[in-house]
Amino acid sequence: MDGHFIIEQGARSWNGLYMNFNGTAGIWSKEAIVDAGGWHFDTLTEDLDLSYRVQLRNWKTKFLFDVVTPSELPVDMNAYKSQQHRWAKGSIQTAKKLLPLVFRRNDSFIRKLEACIHLNQYMVHPMMIIL
């Protein structure tokens, strides 16, 4: 899991793309959280939701390669499936909630496109079945 986050989050940070803080590994400014409207509980991925809202309010984010934080991984396949279901549902909830705001911003086409792909990444699975 560490390798995945190093590559994904590092690339997002390095390229100025929207990135998400993982619930167990974000260091937040209280002012940024308040400015973005605080924690919302209308999505299953409140950390993803807050990450995007903070950036939509022009707060800067950065991935720190040299900071190590422990995290818990699912202990069995059922726990993994449950985690992935929450992440999939929450990502799509966040996409429905925030992509209209992303599209209205004065961001580059690439940044908007990548945000769309990032928030809708779990849609690949049903699309594979359909196609």
Which residues make up each language-model segment?
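Membrane-embedded multi-pass helical conduit in multi-pass membrane proteins
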Residues: 121-131
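Catalytic donor-sugar/metal-binding loop of nucleotide-sugar-dependent glycosyltransferases
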Residues: 41-42, 51-70
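Long helical/loop segments within the catalytic core of UDP-sugar-dependent glycosyltransferases
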Residues: 1-44, 77-116, 120
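AAA+ P-loop ATPase motor domain of ring mechanoenzymes
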Residues: 70-73, 77
